[in-house]
Amino acid sequence: FAEGEGLIANTAFHGVAVACEAAESATFDTVLLRGCEFDGVHFSGCTFRDVRFEGCRFTRCSMERAWLSRCDVLSCSAPGLNLLQARLSSVLFEETDLSYANLSEASIDRVAIRGSRLREAAMQSVKAKRLVFSDSDLTRLDVFGTGLAGIDLSTCAFEAPVLSADYRELRGAVVSAEQALSLSTLLGFVIAEE
């Protein structure tokens, strides 16, 4: 695999298993990764451009400070994936498990997350533009310091989010009536039975 500022381009990998490797600062350009397993692999500082991940598994992996541009992450398992301070631009996550993942301090633009799990994931202090969630599990998502204004969460499971004391992250978020009732308990409201 690429090690330190290496370049992997115009290729495909099927069923490859990589463990305890460092591909830091490598560039992956126009690459298909299908059914691959990564265990303890450090992709810190890597560039992923026009990369498609299909059915891949990431265990104890880090993409800290990585740049993902025009990437598709489809039907992957990546619980606990570290994307701290990553830059994501034109990225699709579909039917992917990102539970416990850390996307804190990431810069996100034109990212769609569909049918995916982000249970107890961290998205603290994220700079987000054109972020779309649909039909995803966002239970206990930590959005401390991340504004959700204009982001439609109405088709998602969005319960017990981690927020700042004044709940400012929720200002302008689009939620369903049922979600609004659930979130109102954070403010101490008690809903009367009719």
Where are these regions (language model features)?
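Tandem repeat scaffolds
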Residues: 1-194
